[in-house]
Every structure is written in structure tokens, then in C-alpha cells.
């Protein structure tokens, strides 16, 4: 199935969806595909991590989750970019009728604690989530086997020239890529489970940039086209596995403060790396940042 074009705005080589969280969910619910939500530190990884670049390039839809990126874009480029946070996207998914259908949602989670919290949330909120709808991800290691198609280009990165309409023309979907593996991740057990259950929506709740790589891997390994949501910690903000972030804090770009206070040792290094973001926006604007460090082949 070919996804029709939709309005986008380009920042750092990524075409971001223009619209509401509900509209993004409706689009992916109808056509399936890989959706990514780069945080501020993830933009830095575009220069440092070629695996991550390929995973982001493989996305069918990208949302501007980073409040810092949206703010700096407005200050430095004098342009408005609509923000859709991963939290808002996840809540919009939960508000759909699809979320109430047994077996439709499948969660990939970072820990047994996250699984327990997800199941408790489902029971308390009336969602038919069972233990079989949850998968605790292993600690993924980078593969030493490199994909020879290092210039693979997918949906979220810009085409060579910007379209006059401001809408992104999507490439035809092709899951018949037996030799393709997503950058740095393989999990045949997970693929087998998903193939058996065939959920319509796959929520990848692991973080650290691994969610996008796993999402790209699943997109090309599965024989059908579900919606794959690479939204990191966002489900945990709702289920209680992570610190609760009020919607007002998310709306005013200060949700990161709540997270930092809850996990300073883990998050401070990642947030500190985001100090490079304003310089990247000033230097590259709409263009894809150059890769600073090439991965080993």
C-alpha cells in the first residue's frame, strides 16, 4: 500500500508531519508504517551515529517531539513548526476505538516493571491489554554485520529537492527485503511473536535511540504493515513506569524538567549533549547534517 502525501515542514533534513496528534494517528491507523519522534539528543545522533541516521531515514512519518528543537527553530529560523509530543501521540492512540479492541496494541517495553505498570494501567483504565500483548526487550547490542546499502533512503528524510506543494511524496512500501536488517538490531524472537499475534499497533517503549532502530528492523522483517510507534518513554508517563508529566508541562516544553529531576544520572548526559542543537539548526537549517563520524564497516 502506498501512503498518500501529507503536509510537512522540513528541519535538519527530516520532513515533520504538520497537523494534530489525532490526525497523525488516523493516518498511520489507515496506512500503517513507521513513525518516529526524535528528541533533542537524537538530532545530535544524526551527526554521530550512521545506524541511527538510517533508521530515521526509514520512517514513514516523523513528528516534532522535541520542544527545544521547535523553540530554537522559531528563534533562529523565524519559522513556526508544530510540535506533537510522543506523550500526546500515545494519548491520541489510546483515545481511538482501535485501542479498545483486544490484541490490537502490542507493547515493547524496557523492563518487567514497565510490563507490570502497563498491565495495571490497562486493567484500571479499561483497556484489554494482557501479558501476551507485552514484550520485555533484551538489552540490544550493535551488530557487527553492516548492511551494504549504506545510502538506503526511506520516507522521513528529504528527497533531493523540496516539493513545491510542501507535501511529502512517499515511496512505495516494500517489505520483501530478506537481506535487509535494521541498523544494529536483530530480534527474530520478537518478529515471530508479532507475526503470530498480528497487532495493528506496535508501541516501542524502549529509549536511548534504540527504539527507532528496532522499529526500522521490524518494518522490514514483518510480512504485514502495522503502525510502529517509536515513542520511547512516552507510554511510561501514562502507565506510571516513568514520572508522571502533566499535559500542561508537556504543552509548555518543560516535561524534560520532570524527567531530569526523577532520573538525573541517566538523563543529564543525554540532555547535556543537546546543547549542540542550536548550532546545528543555525548551520544546516533544512539540510541533512553531515555525518561527523563514519561507522566502522
Sequence positions of predicted segments:
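Short glycine-rich anion-binding loops that position phosphate/pyrophosphate groups of nucleotides
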Residues: 40-43, 68, 206-211, 234-235
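A short helix->loop->beta-strand "cap" motif at the edges of active sites that frequently abuts
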Residues: 32, 101-102, 223-227
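An alpha-beta-alpha
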Residues: 97-125, 272-287
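A transmembrane-helix-recognition feature enriched in membrane-embedded lipid enzymes
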Residues: 68-71, 244-294
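N-terminal nucleotide/polyanion-binding subdomain common to many enzyme families
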Residues: 1-91
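Proline-aspartate-enriched helix->loop->beta-strand connector
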Residues: 194, 198-208
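Short, flexible loop segments at boundaries between secondary-structure elements
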Residues: 136-140, 224-262
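Intrinsic disorder/low-complexity segments
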Residues: 1, 99-100, 123, 128-129, ...
